[in-house]
Amino acid sequence: MDRFVSHFTNRLDAKGRVSIPASFRAVLARDGFEGLYVHPSIDAEAIDCGGHGLLREIDELLGRLSPYSEERDMFSTALLGTSEILKVDSEGRVVLTENVKTYAGIGSEVTFVGQGYKFQIWEPGRFRTHLEEARNRVRDLRKQLSSRPVAPDAQPPRPHGARE
């Protein structure tokens, strides 16, 4: 699978290193990125992490904005100007910099959270709070979506190969 999925909590060692979950390392290895690209999340007190897949998403976002626009400059500063490339050692560990730890409020443990093309690193307590909020919002959204009428011209999908 070429997606970051699930979540894992790991401790930092005395040197400030933390082991990236094996399934996440496997995705990074298939991606071919040397190291770990990280930047502070623009939506949460967490760190966005990934390889070429994350950089492609950032490039696509920036590509939709006018090259000299204020919006592009702001996104570029937030997503590229605050980024770091962390070295992954032979045992799959990274040293989290002080900037990273301070932004995310990280102490002795971190939670790695898969998000498809990227993953996030959270302080575990903050992640639990965020997860509870996310589940509540998804429940509310599901209720809103299920109460909407189905469009009259909407057709259910036909099985592959079915004729009209």
From Swiss-Prot:
Cellular component aspect of the GO annotation: cytoplasm; nucleoid
GO MF term set: DNA-binding transcription factor activity; transcription cis-regulatory region binding
GO BP terms: negative regulation of DNA-templated transcription initiation
Location in or out of the cell: Cytoplasm, Nucleoid
Positions of the SpoVT-AbrB domain: 7-60, 83-126
InterPro entries per the UniProt record, alphabetical: MraZ, MraZ_C, MraZ_dom, MraZ_N, MraZ_sf, SpoVT-AbrB_dom, SpoVT-AbrB_sf
Family per record: Belongs to the MraZ family.
Name used for this protein in its record: Transcriptional regulator MraZ
Species this protein is from: Beijerinckia indica subsp. indica (strain ATCC 9039 / DSM 1715 / NCIMB 8712)
